């Protein structure tokens, strides 16, 4: 029985190879039924050695090999596709596709796609996509995407994205994103973002972001942000911001807690056991600051509690061992216990 099956497989392999350059043998019609060979337009059950110069295939397609000349990857496939070793060969692929090594399309790939090593599209990838190593697209990725190593998009990434090492996009990332080492975007990151090392964005981060080392953005960070060492942004940090070492930005709004908290304008409730700092030409603290040293090189509006408190100008109260207000007249600038503005 095994020998019969083996002989049939060899004959089928040779037949597919010989028909791969032609139109194939199709029963009962040239365009539908059961097809063997490189039929470029067909509906039904189709077996082929290499797909090339396809127009449109609908149904169940089994391909043995792939064409290394990507100019021959044309047309559209819709249905259930199985590739040994890869399910590729068309510009667009829609439906359910599985490849021992990879599943791919020159342009768009949508549906359920499982590749032993990778799933990729030259333009967009959408649906449920699992790559043994990676899921990638030159354009956008949408849906549920799992790459044991990485999920990466040249443009936007949307949905549930899990990369064993990293999740990254050249544009925006939106949804639930977990990168074993990093979640990174050249644009904005929005949603729930988890990483062992870094969550980083070239523009803004909004939502819940948790990272073992750093949560950082070139512009703004907003929401609930927890960085093992640092939470920071080039313009502003807003919301609940927690870090073991530092929270820093030009503007900080909300509740912030770290060993060091600093910025040009800090509004809200800040806890910095080691050092709280306001600096800049228009520096201001508005709210409550708790720190061993509240170093406000600007305007304090609110309450500062610490061992040492320092402010240029004040509309509020300092409580601590040593309290200094530079705008007060001599004799009232440095006081124990508390200080305020004395005209």
Q: PLM features: residue spans?
A:
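N-terminal signal peptide c-region/cleavage motif recognized by signal peptidases
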Residues: 17-19
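Repetitive helical segments and hydrophobic/amphipathic motifs
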Residues: 12-15
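Bacterial N-terminal signal peptides that target proteins for export
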Residues: 1-9
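Surface-exposed, glycine- and small/polar-enriched segments that build interaction surfaces at terminal
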Residues: 22-343
């Amino acid at each position: 029985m095994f020998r019969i099956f083996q002989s049939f497989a060899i004959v089928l392999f040779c037949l597919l190879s010989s028909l791969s350059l032609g139109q194939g043998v199709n029963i009962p019609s040239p365009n539908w039924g059961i097809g063997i060979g490189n039929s470029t337009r067909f509906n039904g059950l189709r077996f082929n050695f290499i797909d090339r110069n396809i127009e449109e295939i609908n149904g169940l397609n089994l391909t043995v090999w792939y064409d290394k000349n990507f100019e021959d990857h044309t047309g559209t496939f819709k249905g259930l596709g199985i590739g040994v070793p890869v399910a590729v060969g068309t510009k667009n692929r829609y439906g359910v596709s599985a490849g021992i090594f990879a599943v791919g399309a020159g342009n768009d790939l949508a549906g359920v796609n499982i590749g032993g090593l990778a799933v990729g599209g030259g333009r967009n990838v959408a649906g449920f996509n699992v790559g043994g190593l990676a899921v990638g697209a030159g354009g956008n990725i949408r849906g549920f995407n799992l790459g044991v190593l990485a999920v990466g998009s040249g443009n936007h990434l949307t949905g549930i994205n899990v990369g064993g090492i990293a999740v990254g996009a050249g544009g925006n990332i939106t949804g639930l994103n977990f990168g074993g080492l990093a979640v990174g975007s050249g644009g904005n990151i929005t949603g729930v973002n988890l990483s062992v090392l870094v969550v980083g964005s070239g523009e803004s981060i909004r939502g819940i972001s948790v990272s073992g080392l750093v949560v950082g953005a070139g512009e703004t960070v907003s929401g609930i942000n927890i960085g093992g060492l640092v939470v920071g942004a080039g313009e502003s940090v807003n919301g609940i911001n927690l870090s073991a070492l530092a929270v820093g930005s030009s503007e900080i709004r909300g509740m912030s807690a770290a060993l060091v908290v600093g910025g040009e304008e800090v509004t809200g409730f800040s806890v910095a056991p080691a050092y709280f700092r306001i600096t800049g030409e228009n520096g201001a603290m508005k709210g409550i600051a708790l720190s061993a040293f509240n170093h406000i090189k600007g305007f304090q509006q609110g309450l500062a509690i610490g061992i040492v408190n320092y402010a240029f100008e004040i509309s509020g109260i300092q409580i601590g061992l040593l309290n200094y207000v530079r705008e007060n007249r001599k004799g009232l600038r440095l006081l124990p216990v508390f200080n305020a503005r004395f005209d």
